Amino acid sequence: MRVTTGRCPQNASSRPLKVALVGECMIEMRGDPASGFSQTFGGDTLNTAVYLSRLSPASHIVTDYITAVGTDSFSDAMRQLWRDEGVGDGHVRIIDGAQPGLYFIQTDAQGERRFLYWRGEAAARQTFDGPQADALLQALADYDYLYLSGISLAILTATGRECLLQALRRARASGTRIVFDNNYRPHLWPDAEAARQAYGDLLRLTDLALITWEDDALLFGYADAEALFEAYGAFGVSEVALKRGEAACLIQCTDGRFEVPAEQVRHIVDTTAAGDSFSAAYLACRLQGGDPSLAARWGHRLAAQVVQHRGALIPRTAMPSLALPSFSSAVEA
């Protein structure tokens, strides 16, 4: 992503930027047998899509979600939630007889989470499988930005993943920018080498990488941030935001390398979607003309608010106030 002074690109082209996030939304259950359970929906890229939509005026940025769902009532409720949040579902694939995946979240006294998943037969695994996916794959090139995570890659069949990567290559060749959040979950991959191969294929197409240090260390094992930045530079990634939890975020971009301190939170309730919300705020700021330093501050501010609430999606009334300075630079699309 290149930063220039001047007006935002959507103003110059008289249309909003089109952004699509690719991944999986699941049925979320929270609680325990003793106290009971509550049900909602979640998923890393879906969480990011919702927060991106909340932070982006519809006149500037159109946010869509790309996945596959079934014909059951939970799938219908998911799509209604997305629409209510301003997230478009026009490119959601509907598969007869399929259904969403499901997961349980349990949190300890420090707000750290334990997940139990049932997703092996989820509709999202088939998003890019078969000839029925051809139109969806072609539509990826219609977007200005495509956002994916490591989970977006992991949940797909091997055939679907390769079809997606081929479509991403075509889209990027036609001018689409790629944003990648590494979110590495070892249990979703047959082995680490398969994950490294898929990540490498996508990183070679990536313009902006939003990286969680712990996940990256687990997969690639870089000794320090310097080694990570060098490796991502070799992949051709022009902007990297390295998320390190409560520590400062480290940025590598065309302006050099620098750090942006995190906001301190006295009482953490639930860390679910902390990284997803950071990524959403960072991207929202960049797409509206903010520089990487301001984008990281937006990310820290939203993440700090999210971890003080239970669940991935906080109430709209709890969203922090985030604003761009009038002299902000613009992201060149």
Task: Tell where the protein language model's regions lie, with residue ranges.
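Glycine-rich phosphate/adenosyl-contacting loop at the front of the ribokinase-like
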Residues: 1-87, 333
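Conserved phosphate-binding/catalytic region of the ribokinase-like
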Residues: 2-17, 221-333
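Structural motif
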Residues: 18-20, 144-145, 208
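Active-site metal-binding loops of divalent metal-dependent hydrolases
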Residues: 25, 182, 277
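Short, electropositive alpha-helical surface patch
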Residues: 74-87, 171-172, 195-206, 228-229, ...
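Active-site glycine- and acidic-residue-rich loops that bind
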Residues: 124-125, 153-162, 186-193, 219
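Conserved phosphate/ATP/ADP-binding segment of small-molecule kinases
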Residues: 174, 184-257
